[in-house]
Amino acid sequence: MRIGFNLPQFGSHAHHPEGVAEFARRAEEMGADSLWVGDRLLAPLEPEVNYPGTTAFPAEFRAGLDPFAALTVAAVVTTRPLLGSSVLVAPWYAPPLLARSLATIDQLSGGRVIAGLGAGWSPEEFRAVGVPMGERGSRFDECLDALAAYWGTNPVEHHGRFWTTAAGYVDVKPVQRPGPPVYLAAFTPAGMTRVGRRADGFLPAVTPGPFEPTIVTGPMSRIRAAAARAGRDPHELGVILRVNTMAGDSVHGIAEVVLRARDEAAVDHAFVDLTYRDLATSVEHAVDLAGRVLDLVRAR
């Protein structure tokens, strides 16, 4: 089973950006299989929608390092772990810029990027970037089309409802061909259908507490059915599980969630956000927790 960790990107860690390189190096030395970033712009004072699975907007999202910059740092100080996003909010970005950033990081890392993308959910953040939230689904679909075009063969060309690219040359391509694997987060029937039709895999998440296998198996059943309807092999789709934590969670409890996901939901790749809700108070603390989680999971 592959085990990874979020980079120290949010909350108090954002005020110590040197910790990104330090954690990435030390996580690789301990044998971590992947390193991850998220994508948040602000923490609204009076949110219209709270963070999924909670009744509040986590305070750590008041400060967040740029995900592309954090992944770039991790790319240049490591050689082995996969580098993923969970998730980049695809509708916020012009596809040519998103394609270029991910292709560049894939080049810098020697082909280790996992492009984890989502449709987004915070109305305040959509307004901040000037993108109508009601268009997020259609923009997301078109973004996937445009990424495939930009990462494909020259000449690159795209004509859509929101973006148009005249035929031209884009010679910086991802190392991975035809592009980095694309994993999508999904919470709605339409989102799960999109995963089945278009993605390489699914990015579910679990919040602190006992692990319930149907959090993974239920959506994956619907996703694989959508893949079959689209003429794809349902069993080719992967699952990478995000495990959120919070202050007070025990290392044994975190490891138990990962192990139950492996044994009861056939999850073969999971990553733990040790900085979510202030579980790890420093990079040194995060490194210690990561090492202990790795030891417990790999012992079983």
What label would you give each PLM region?
Residues 1-300:
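Active-site-adjacent structural elements that line small-molecule/cofactor binding pockets in enzymes
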